[in-house]
Amino acid sequence: MNITEFAQYAGVSKAAVSRYFNGGYLSAEKRAQIETAVEATGYRPSMQAQMLRTRRTRQVGVILPKLSSDSCPRMVEGIGSVLEESGYQLLLINTANDTKKELQALDTLRQHTVDGIILIAALYTPEHKTLLEHLHVPIVTLGQNFPGCCSVYHDDAGAAQAATAHMLAKGRRAPGYIGVTLLDKCAGQQRRAGFEAALKAAGLPLHPERMAVAKFSQESGYEQAAKLLERSPHIDCLFCATDAIALGAMQYCREHSIRIPEDVMIASVGDSKVGRNAFVPLTSAHLHYKTAGRDAAALLMELLADPHTVPRSQMLGFELVCRESTND
């Protein structure tokens, strides 16, 4: 069935059918007629024809670093709700924390002629900078504040500072830190900056030997906690950049008779389900991942409506959720 035949069946003009499928204005009566006809016939316009006419695919590419993480599905849920409301389809690419795959995904989506891209980035490298400058596709970065791009990100420094300060306020004076690579501007640089700010505010010196860098996994958190606590057994509280790292550190403590929170308090960022249900419930800063996804998608819709929109950044807040790992 072509558009002429469908319009005749629905009892409306071809122009009305076109406005309906392209999100234009229609009277309630005509919209109801077309919806009834769609249900009866299953008619959908040709995607190729729409692309030729509007130069739009009604598709948005979303690149994420780890589908199995606790945060990414929540962000994608928020993105998907806005895209659905706006009549867009979501194309998802999982890069498994591989920077090369992330860069390849950006190039693939550019060639696939998607209308826009939301990048849930793991790192910001010189290669990212070069590719983003020459992308020529509307893009919003989510979770990272990239220069020159529209971005939605979290107050990572504030979250880390609050989590660390909470333990110091309970009298702990030998804090340790397990972070992630500084190539990650938010989870790496900003959360470390927050940890350091908490120590400075408390009048405590920074001891590099009490600091370690892990990968984004529970296994790596376990390994780095082992090295850190064997090297500095007097550590009495530990800030971890992610819940996964914190859970690995907690597992090491349990296996080596280090009591949480009596011997070592532990806090982190993410407020994941596994952290909430850990053998010692984990104190963690709650980040609004679903809201971030919705806001990023809404920002992309603004870019698509007006390509001359001035790039802007939006930082979301957090709540520190205190639990038994910090004696709460």
PLM region descriptions:
Residues 226-328:
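Flexible loop/turn connectors
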Residues 97, 120-162, 182-183, 204, ...:
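Flexible loop/hinge segments that line or gate small-molecule binding clefts
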Residues 152-177, 193-197, 218-226, 246, ...:
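Hydrophobic alpha-helical segments within soluble ligand-binding/sensing domains
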Residues 114-120, 176-179, 211, 232-242, ...:
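Periplasmic-binding protein-like
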Residues 33, 71-85, 159-163, 186-205, ...:
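Short, solvent-exposed amphipathic alpha-helices that sit
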Residues 1-58:
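N-terminal helix-turn-helix DNA-binding module of bacterial transcription factors
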Residues 163-204, 312-325:
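An alpha-beta-alpha
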Residues 43-116, 193-196, 207, 237:
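Amphipathic helical "hinge" segments at domain boundaries
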